[in-house]
């Protein structure tokens, strides 16, 4: 009975270690189903990492009585709220795969700059020990999304057609209340944006490859 979950975990780990299809000379082309499975696993991992980091930051720096009011004030703070991206699964299902990939790429690229400051801000290795690897994980997911775009668009992704935007960098002055609130807001947006990217990828994967695990 224990073999099933263990096999699934080993398969998930193996997929996370797979290269993307850019190394054409060294590896054969990866099936589209594997590209989607790989991207979904990476997005899930990043979303969980973002959620855990947000929760630990909140626990360490934000008094419990202030959290709800601060979260409400930050509702319109995220850049992703200013673009016509789907806000949930139902809306995502109304968009084409190419549209969803472009929105996913935009969300990922908007964080490539800011997350490079994570390891400077969150120096507690017990709480934020993986923060210095977030950039590499985002770059890896970016490559995976671009590989999917090449497959579905039958050519190179037209990145120039996407309005590129980025968030402010994280503030390293953790003794300032303003800096704490800014970083809290950024982490909230990071978690929200990674959840959107994960949702888009899962919607695409499920409608292309019917699975029993599509409910989410």
From Swiss-Prot:
Keywords: Disulfide bond, Hormone, Metal-binding, Phosphoprotein, Secreted, Signal, Zinc. Pfam families: Hormone_1. CDD domains: somatotropin_like. GO terms for cellular component: extracellular space. InterPro entries: 4_helix_cytokine-like_core, Somatotropin, Somatotropin/Prolactin, Somatotropin_CS. Residues 1-26 form the signal peptide. It is found in: Secreted. The modification Phosphoserine is found at residue 131. Disulfide bonds join 78-189, 206-214. Zn(2+) binds at residues 45, 198. One of its GO terms (molecular function) is growth hormone receptor binding. One of its GO terms (biological process) is positive regulation of receptor signaling pathway via JAK-STAT. Plays an important role in growth control. Its major role in stimulating body growth is to stimulate the liver and other tissues to secrete IGF1. It stimulates both the differentiation and proliferation of myoblasts. It also stimulates amino acid uptake and protein synthesis in muscle and other tissues. Belongs to the somatotropin/prolactin family. This is Somatotropin.
């Amino acid at each position: 009975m224990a073999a099933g979950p263990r096999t699934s975990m080993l398969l998930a780990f193996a997929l996370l270690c797979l290269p993307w299809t850019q190394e054409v000379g060294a590896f054969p082309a990866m099936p589209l189903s594997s590209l989607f499975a790989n991207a979904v696993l990476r997005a899930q991992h990043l979303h969980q990492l973002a959620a855990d980091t947000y929760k630990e930051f909140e626990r360490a720096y934000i008094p419990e009585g202030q959290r709800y009011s601060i979260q409400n004030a930050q509702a319109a703070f995220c850049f992703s709220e200013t673009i016509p991206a789907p806000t949930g699964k139902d809306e995502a299902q109304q968009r084409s795969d190419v549209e969803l990939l472009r929105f996913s790429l935009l969300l990922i690229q908007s964080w490539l700059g800011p997350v490079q400051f994570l390891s400077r801000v969150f120096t507690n290795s017990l709480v934020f020990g993986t923060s210095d690897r977030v950039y590499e994980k985002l770059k890896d997911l970016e490559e995976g999304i671009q590989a999917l775009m090449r497959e579905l668009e039958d050519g190179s992704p037209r990145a120039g057609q996407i309005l590129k935007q980025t968030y402010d960098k994280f503030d390293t002055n953790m003794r300032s209340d303003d800096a704490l609130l800014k970083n809290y807001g950024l982490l909230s947006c990071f978690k929200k944006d990674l959840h959107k990217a994960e949702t888009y990828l899962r919607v695409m994967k499920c409608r292309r490859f019917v699975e029993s695990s599509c409910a989410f």
